[in-house]
Swiss-Prot record:
Its main location: membrane. The chain crosses the membrane at residues 5-25. GO terms for biological process: cytochrome complex assembly; photosynthesis. GO terms for molecular function: electron transporter, transferring electrons within cytochrome b6/f complex of photosystem II activity. The 4 large subunits of the cytochrome b6-f complex are cytochrome b6, subunit IV (17 kDa polypeptide, PetD), cytochrome f and the Rieske protein, while the 4 small subunits are PetG, PetL, PetM and PetN. The complex functions as a dimer. This is Cytochrome b6-f complex subunit 5. GO terms for cellular component: cytochrome b6f complex; plasma membrane-derived thylakoid membrane. The lineage of its organism: Bacteria, Bacillati, Cyanobacteriota, Cyanophyceae, Synechococcales. InterPro entries: Cyt_6/f_cplx_su5, Cyt_6/f_cplx_su5_sf.
Length: 38
């Protein structure tokens, strides 16, 4: 049986991690457009 605390931590970290990756990718995408050296 999964501990409620552990389950809460996992369910709390997953959206934060996905949001962090999305923001990082978005910033890198905008930075790539601003400084396009190709």
């Amino acid at each position: 049986m999964i501990e409620p605390l552990l389950l809460g931590i996992v369910l709390g970290l997953i959206p934060v991690t996905l949001a962090g990756l999305f923001v990082a990718a978005y910033l890198q995408y905008k930075r790539g457009n601003q400084f396009n050296l190709d």
